[in-house]
UniProtKB/Swiss-Prot annotation:
GO cellular component: cytoplasm
Key word Phosphoprotein present: no
Phylogenetic lineage: Archaea, Methanobacteriati, Thermoplasmatota, Thermoplasmata, Thermoplasmatales
Family named by the database record: Belongs to the GrpE family.
Database matches in PROSITE patterns: GRPE (PS01071)
Localization in the cell: Cytoplasm
Protein name: Protein GrpE
GO BP annotation list: protein folding
Complex formation: Homodimer.
């Protein structure tokens, strides 16, 4: 049998231990690098996720903006068309005073226009509202009550298209102004 020198064995053990230490250090370094790469990848993933969410939110906001813009364009186009129809309604109102047979035509036209958001302002017998009514005459009577509509007013999609021209009563005053 062969006998080994104690120094030689110690030297081999030392080399083995040192080799293991180096391997362990290399693995540790490699693991640290992998951990850093993993952490960077997770950070990048989070950044991309946030970017995606922002882009998605911006796209949804843009779609809502486009829809709102299209609806406004439609509403304005309808408003322009309906405004041009108001003199026709005024003519029908004047014609009804002479011929009741025009009432169904006016009703039909109002029904069609109401499908596009037009509403008549009902003022007669109600308290004067400066947002809905324009005073064209004042008569003696209860304060601020609309006694007569000289010209109908209209609301389109909750916005005043044309104010009603009205005669309003004022308490204790004689007829002061009556412009027709």
């Amino acid at each position: 049998m062969m006998t080994y020198n104690k120094k030689y064995i110690d030297s081999v053990e030392y080399d083995l231990i040192e080799t293991r230490k180096r391997m362990w250090m290399m693995e540790r370094k490699k693991n640290e690098e992998l951990l850093k790469k993993y952490q960077q990848a997770m950070s990048d993933l989070e950044d991309y996720k946030n970017l995606y969410m922002r882009q998605r939110s911006e796209m949804e906001n843009y779609q809502r903006y486009i829809e709102k813009t299209i609806n406004n364009i439609k509403a304005n186009a309808n408003a322009d068309l309906i405004k041009t129809m108001l003199p026709v309604l005024d003519s029908l109102d004047a014609g009804i005073l002479h011929d009741e047979k025009l009432k169904p035509i006016r009703s039909q036209l109002i029904k069609i226009l109401s499908n596009y958001g037009l509403k008549e302002i009902e003022s007669r017998g109600k308290k004067f509202d400066p947002y809905l009514n324009e005073v064209v005459g004042i008569v003696k009577g209860d304060d601020d009550i609309v006694v007569e509509e000289v010209q109908k007013g209209y609301i389109l999609n909750n916005e005043v298209l044309r104010t009603s021209k009205v005669i309003v009563s004022k308490g204790g005053n004689n007829e002061q102004d009556n412009r027709n």
